[in-house]
A protein has these predicted regions:
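C-terminal and inter-domain tail/linker signature
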Residues: 1-156
Length: 156
């Protein structure tokens, strides 16, 4: 996964602590260093992917989710287009591009280009991430197969 960014808002050109925490997490994510990503989170945190209707409060489970995303979308590239920040919150607008292999006809697969815009809202407390929420279009992202691995089935 590649993550790059350019800040389009002059007010956010000067990095603040919340910006640095987010950028450290995104850089580690791009490099596949999930231990470093998880180190940026508080012990008590919430990571919510609203498109997939998934919520993580456990670092091990979040690490599994991030690894599964990388496995299914190894060429993904997340580019930050705008960053807005306040005292303890960073909002990042981004574009995610990737390719996805999916079944086609009977036994073949086809590669489908993925391009989706999204927003991450990240709250920082004591220099660590306490809440991270991602918002984007589930259908365009084609991430639903990954989500199925993390959905708990309840017998009725």
């Amino acid at each position: 996964m590649k993550i790059s960014g350019s800040v389009l808002n002059d007010a956010s050109l000067h990095a603040t602590s919340p910006d640095r925490v987010l950028q450290t997490a995104l850089t580690a994510l791009r490099q596949g260093n999930f231990v470093e990503v998880l180190d940026q989170f508080n012990d008590q945190f919430t990571f919510t992917d609203h498109a997939l209707d998934l919520e993580f409060k456990d670092k091990e489970r979040l690490g599994e989710f991030l690894a599964k995303m990388r496995e299914h979308f190894p060429d993904s590239d997340r580019r930050t287009t705008t960053i807005f920040n306040s005292e303890d919150c960073v909002t990042s607008e981004w574009i995610l591009t990737a390719t996805h292999s999916e079944p086609f006809l009977t036994r073949s697969f086809r590669k489908v280009s993925v391009c989706v815009r999204g927003v991450s809202v990240v709250q920082i407390e004591h220099g660590r991430i306490s809440h991270w929420s991602d918002y984007y279009d589930q259908v365009q992202s084609r991430r639903y197969t990954v989500a199925a691995s993390f959905t708990e089935w309840i017998a009725v």
